[in-house]
């Protein structure tokens, strides 16, 4: 196993409209994989909760707390790793002095603070806010799709700028809706090199 890789099960919460019991059943399905398959190699490290809310609400906090604790307290996950993906946290919220107290970030190891088209990342209000927040970058991820045809030097610069907002990053040039993450993009190899400090062949 590689220490920098986390194998995660996928559970959508539908912004907490999915019945919590259904979410817990899906978590249990992933937890049971090694037993059902009789193969310990199918043990996952945690859960990627997609479609989580971005603005704080006590009911939604309680919902996500139950879901996260099912992973954190379970004995069948290798690292008890929890990721929340609200898709976008409003810039005004993420730069608020009370963000840490009025968010769900204490329930997860990583929160995806921005998942969007590359050109929306370039919007001034978004770019400035995501680079000026004061939360530990190790708690945040940024996912960008629909990148244009960039030179390696420009890609290095883009990765460097994204890493000013988050330690966990993923970039792809795939621009077809519902296909963004179904394959390795043509820039994947260069992207990995850029994350590794812009190393050239």
What are the roles of these predicted feature ranges?
Residues 1-201:
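Glycan-processing catalytic domains of CAZymes
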């Amino acid at each position: 196993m590689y220490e920098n890789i986390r194998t995660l099960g996928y559970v959508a919460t539908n912004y907490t409209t999915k019945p919590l019991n259904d979410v817990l059943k899906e978590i249990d399905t992933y937890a049971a994989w090694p037993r059902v398959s009789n193969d310990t190699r199918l043990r996952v490290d945690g859960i990627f909760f997609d479609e989580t809310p971005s603005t704080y609400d006590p009911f939604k906090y309680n919902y996500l707390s139950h879901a996260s604790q099912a992973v954190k307290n379970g004995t069948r996950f290798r690292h008890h790793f929890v990721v929340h993906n609200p898709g976008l946290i409003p810039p005004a919220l993420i730069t608020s002095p009370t963000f840490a107290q009025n968010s769900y970030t204490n329930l997860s190891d990583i929160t995806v603070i921005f998942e969007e088209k590359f050109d929306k990342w370039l919007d001034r209000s978004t770019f400035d806010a995501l680079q000026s927040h004061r939360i530990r970058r190790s708690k945040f991820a940024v996912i960008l799709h629909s990148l244009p045809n960039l030179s390696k030097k420009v890609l290095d610069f883009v990765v460097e700028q994204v890493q000013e907002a988050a330690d966990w990053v993923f970039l792809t040039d795939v621009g077809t809706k519902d296909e963004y993450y179904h394959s390795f993009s043509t820039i994947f190899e260069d992207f990995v090199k850029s994350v590794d400090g812009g190393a050239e062949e």
